[in-house]
Amino acid sequence: QTRAREEIPNLAVKRTLQVFIGNEPRLVGTAHYDQNGAREHAAFSYDATWLDAPDRFALEPNLPLVTGAQFHRKAPEGSVFPAAMADTEPDGWGRRVILRDHARRRQGARRSGKDAGPAQLNAVDFLLAVDDGSRVGALRFRDEAGVFQRTSEPERRTAPPLLELRHLMAASRAV
């Protein structure tokens, strides 16, 4: 029975994320993610302070500067999130890396007798698995506990800093 439960996607997941922009984070709005079995949807609403700011702008054409929740319809093979947020999600290779890391962490947790967490990852898990410091674009996400996601954990691999990229490129050319 335990094995069968692990293969079923998370039964119900609700997440609320604050969406910020820039290194000196300015609150832009709130994203809501809901999953019920295989069904999932997301909504975004601008924060009132963002809407009142003289330098405000729409994050994308499909998210006009209006009050209230704006729902995004997931296209087949598309993201559940609006395009501005979807652009920060990992690509296919990144998703594979995240899945392998997730499997390795679950295996380690099981060996040490700890809760291994869910077997499958959902859209918000992938969105938040990207390093906050190396995420594409200027959007940053803060979880319900007030922590920017994903903050690098000590002794955990992350995307290499920009300073190391020149060395990595040289090494790849040498191969």
Model feature map: region roles:
Residues 1-175:
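Phosphate/dinucleotide-binding and metal-coordinating scaffold of catalytic cores
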